[in-house]
A protein has these predicted regions:
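Conserved class I S-adenosyl-L-methionine
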Residues: 41-50
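Glycine-rich SAM-binding Motif I of class I
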Residues: 52-56
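Class I SAM-dependent methyltransferase Rossmann-like catalytic core
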Residues: 3-36
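Conserved SAM-binding strand-loop segment of SAM-dependent methyltransferases
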Residues: 88-97
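A short glycine-rich, Lys/Arg-flanked "PGG" loop and its adjoining helix->strand segment in the class I
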Residues: 126-138
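Conserved SAM/SAH-binding beta-strand->alpha-helix loop
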Residues: 74
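Conserved beta-strand signature within the Rossmann-like core of class I S-adenosyl-L-methionine
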Residues: 139-146
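A short acidic, Gly/Pro-enriched loop at the edge of an enzyme's catalytic core
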Residues: 102-111
Length: 182
């Protein structure tokens, strides 16, 4: 069985936690990591690691001294990525993004997220977005991929400067780039 088919089956089986039927496209990977700076991004936090597609792209865009902390609720996905990505900059945490702040002891340069906000409660969404905003350094980004524009207003209420991009793919993938300016 091909890797792509295995991934599709794994994602479909876990649809409520992945929010996707397949891995993100190369275009999404490039766009969502656009604001990671090789010079200034020292700490990047990823929500929803899945099988590590975005994780690999994030690592490609980080400098050698940077750290990536990736959160994933699915133990099998954590094991898979731990077995397939060998990079000292990567720390994998098998926990919900709701709890991310208890693992941090410094400000964050970038958040990269693919978690399905459509399947989270209002309380969970509020906790994640508000704590992410508080944890971000000034002029830093929270970038999110979703299959709908529906949640964009939730991001606009919290972040200072917001942009939504439709990459014209099928299924439709939207990238939200949300910046903390202060």
């Amino acid at each position: 069985m091909s890797t792509k088919l295995k991934t599709t089956l794994a994602f479909t089986k876990n649809l409520l936690t992945t929010g996707a039927f397949t891995e993100t496209s190369k275009n999404v990977e490039k766009e969502i990591t656009r604001f990671i700076s090789l010079d200034t991004s020292k700490l990047v936090v990823e929500f929803g690691m899945g099988h590590g597609n975005l994780t690999r792209e994030i690592l490609k865009n980080m400098c050698p001294e940077s750290k990536l902390i990736s959160f994933e609720v699915n133990k099998d996905f954590c094991s898979y990525v731990g077995d397939t990505i060998s990079d000292n900059r990567l720390t994998i945490i098998n926990d919900s993004a709701v709890n991310f702040s208890k693992y941090l002891d410094e400000k964050v340069d970038n958040f990269i997220s693919s978690i399905p906000f459509s399947f989270l409660t209002k309380e969970e969404t509020s906790i994640i977005l508000n704590e992410a905003y508080t944890s971000l350094k000034s002029n830093s980004y929270f970038s999110q991929v979703l299959y709908t524009r529906f949640n964009f207003k939730k991001f606009q209420k919290i972040f200072d400067d917001n942009e939504i991009i439709n990459l014209g793919s099928f299924p439709t993938e939207y990238i939200y780039h949300c910046r903390k300016t202060s």
